[in-house]
Amino acid sequence: MATKKTIITKDQIVSMYMNYVLEHSEKPKSVYHFTKINDFTETEFYAFFGTIESIEKEIFKMFVDKTIDLLNKNKEYELYDMKGKMLSFYFTFFEILTANRSYVVLVLKEHDNQLKKLMQLSGLRNSFRDYLSEIITDDFRTQQEKLQNFQEKAFLEASWIQLLLTLKFWL
C-alpha cells in the first residue's frame, strides 16, 4: 500500500526556510538543496516561490499580513482613530518581530549593503503602504491639503526672497 504524501503549504515552506537559516546561519545555496534536505520537490517550491530571495521578501510581508489579521480580529479596532490604529499596528508588528527576533536580526544584519536590505524588505514596504492607504481618513487628507497649501505659499515666498538676495548679490 502506497503512502499518501501530504500537500505542502506556503506557510510550511516559509517555516522550513526560517529554520534552515537559523540552523545554518545562511540561506540555502539553491532551491534544489533546500527542497532535498526538507523532503519535498522543487515543483512544490515553485508553486509558491520563484527564487530563494522571493521567500525572504515574503516572510516580511507575512509579518505585516499577520499583524493586520490580528488587529482585525479585535472588534474594537474598527472604532479606533487613525492614530490608534497606527499605534496598534506598531505594537503588534513589533511583538511579531520580537517573537521571530533571532531570524529577523540574522537576516537584516547579514547585508552590509543597504540596497540588499531594502530589496529584502520590499514586500513589507508594499504591504505596509497598502495598510496605510486603508486607514487614512478624510480628516487626515484635509490636514494634508492644508499643509500642502502652506508649503506652497512658503515656497513662493522663499523663492521671492532668493530672487531678491540674488539680485542684491548681482548689484
Short names for language-model regions:
Residues 2, 8-43, 47, 56-61:
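Short, amphipathic alpha-helix enriched in basic
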Residues 10-18, 46-72, 76, 83, ...:
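An amphipathic alpha-helix adjacent to DNA-recognition modules
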Residues 16-23, 66-70, 162-170:
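Solvent-exposed, amphipathic alpha-helical segments
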Residues 58, 73-106, 113, 123, ...:
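Hydrophobic alpha-helical connector segments
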Residues 68, 72, 98, 108, ...:
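Amphipathic, well-packed alpha-helical segments that form the structural scaffold of globular domains
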Residues 79, 141-148:
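Acidic/His metal-coordination segments adjacent to aromatic residues that form catalytic metal sites
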Residues 107-113, 145-148:
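Short linear capping/connector segments at secondary-structure termini
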Residues 117-143, 153-167:
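Amphipathic alpha-helical packing segments from all-alpha helical-bundle domains
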